[in-house]
Structure formats: C-alpha cells, structure tokens
Amino acid sequence: MIEYFLPLLLLCVIQSGTPGPNNIMLTASGKNFGYLKTVPHMAGVVIGFLSLLIVLSLGLISIFITYPLIQTILQIAGSIYLLYLSYRIYNSYSSENNSRSKPITFLESSLFQYVNPKGVMMAITTISIYTDFKSFEFINTFIEGMIFILIAFTISNVFAVLTWTSVGVFLNNFIKSERSIKTFNGFMAILLVLTVIWINYEFYGS
C-alpha cells in the first residue's frame, strides 16, 4: 500500500501546491481579508475539487475524450472567468477603516473548480494513471483507486490552501499603506493573467 499511496500523495502535493489560479487567489485573499474571511474560499477549493474528481470518475472523462470540444469550451470559459477574477483582485482594497470588495464565496470557489483549467487537467491525469488497476497490484478495482485519490487530494489540497492563505496573511504584516496594497493586488492580478496565458499555451500546444 505504501508503495502505491506515497507516490500518489507526492504527485497530488506537487500539483496542488505549485502556483496556479487557486493558490494565487488564496494568497491575495489572505492578504486582503485575513484568515477567517478566506475560510469559505478555502473550503470551496477543497470540496469543489473533490466533487469534480467524483463527477469525472462517474464517466465525464470519457465524454471529454469523445467530445474534445466540450473541454475546449470549458477551457475558454475558465480563462474568461480567471480574467474577471484578476480584474476583481486588481480592484480589491482593504485596510483597517476601508473595504471596497468582498472575498470569494464558498459557492463561487466550488463552482470555479469545474472550469479551472489546471484543476481539470490535474484531475484527469491523476485518475487516468492511478485507477489503472492492471498496472498496480495493490488496487483491484477502479473504486479502490478513486478512494486513494480522494484521500490524497484531500490531504494535499488542505495543505495547499492553508499554506498559500498563510503566505497572504504573513504578507499583511509588511504591506500596510494604500499604495503598497494596490501594488500587491496589481502584481497578483498580473500573475493570474500570466497563468491564464501559460495554461492556454499548454492546452493548445502553441
């Protein structure tokens, strides 16, 4: 079991923990709104992604393979939404006496997982590799493989959302003035836009 689960967990930690749309937005939210107000956002990432894994395991992967246009549409929709979120981050502002924006809600965060290009590809890749019970002696059925995947991604996603939100909260100790806050939000928005460009470059293979 260890020989199967540890490589799976490592893969999930790497995929979940590396910079991407969710982690960039969580860092910005941690900085602008603090830990408590970012909890719904964090919970939405974890639960939304787990629900995506379950939906994909029920047959959506085969639909993507049969009808690639669906994946393309989701890719475009996700990219447009990410650009909107980058604009939203850019216009965020918070200080002790002023607030012009609201953190991402649980529902928004959960639904975003279904159009998050990085997340969808993570899920498809992991399910395709680690549910092949012909390649792994330890698992006997597709369901067993999915159980291990769900456990691994729960651990890795909880670790990732807590870590990246903590980074944002930590940065709040140094970014206090209105000018520095605007600079930070602008930088995070640019990172999100660059992520959109990179994801689409990878997707279309240009």
What are these regions (language model features)?
Residues 20, 34, 116-117, 177:
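Short loop-to-helix capping motifs
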Residues 2-72, 125-149, 153-154:
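Juxtamembrane transmembrane-helix termini in multi-pass membrane transport proteins
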Residues 109, 113-126:
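Selected transmembrane alpha-helices and immediately adjacent juxtamembrane segments
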